[in-house]
């Protein structure tokens, strides 16, 4: 694993260094201008870049800004990107930890962001590595998006919340308290609200009265979308129905569980009052 150097951007050069990586990851149509990034940085926001040894180009970056949610300050992490050769290297976690340190210094308790709920790799990182959770679903949040990751489908998102000072977060970042395999949840009889039927999404279960629920998603959504856009849309709509129903009935997704054969599913539990941070130590 390469040792990355994390540099916090304080000037226009640092912010401008993110542009090529933004274009490679999404497209030139969705680039955040470095001038705007710099203004955000000088008003409580955060930009950090990760560099691999002997490579002057950034291997990844993270960008976020201050916001208010439910009358409390929090940090919104708008972008996180890592170049292909460095994905799975630990750089994404290093960038998130740098962002976390910045926010803790500001007295911020929650870092939040949106993510596509059907992206299994991102789910494993956000829920498994970081210890985040979600209880909010947004239909077509960004509208039609022209970039290569999102074009052709409604831009549905879950709103991910990361309690950066929570003991569970510390444990996850240290590699402790890792989620159990999906097979364990299945052997315990935890019910699926949504389960795959081959490559296709099955129908929703009739009841959500269980104490725990599973919502399965495709193993590799981008590959599925490239192969069969109509099937990808079926998954988008099925996932939408499952999450909206579960969240509407008081559940929150607190884990992403993986099986040895590559299957993956969110674990949902009943959530406490809306104004409380979820305590998921028991999961």
Please report, for each region that a protein language model flagged, where it lies by residue.
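C-terminal "cap" of GNAT-fold acetyltransferases
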Residues: 141-173, 268-278
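Charged, low-complexity intrinsically disordered regulatory/assembly segments
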Residues: 199-283
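Conserved acetyl-CoA pyrophosphate-binding loop and the N-cap/start of the following alpha-helix
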Residues: 86, 90-98
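A conserved beta-strand-loop-helix scaffold within acyl/acetyltransferase catalytic domains
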Residues: 4-84, 257-259
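Conserved GNAT acetyl-CoA-binding A-motif
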Residues: 103-116
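A short helix-loop-beta-strand connector motif used in the catalytic cores of GNAT acetyltransferases and
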Residues: 38-49, 153-155, 248-254, 262-266
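Conserved catalytic-core motifs of GNAT/GCN5-like acyltransferases
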Residues: 114, 124, 131-150, 255-258
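A conserved mid-domain beta-alpha-beta active-site/ligand-binding segment of alpha/beta enzyme cores
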Residues: 162-226
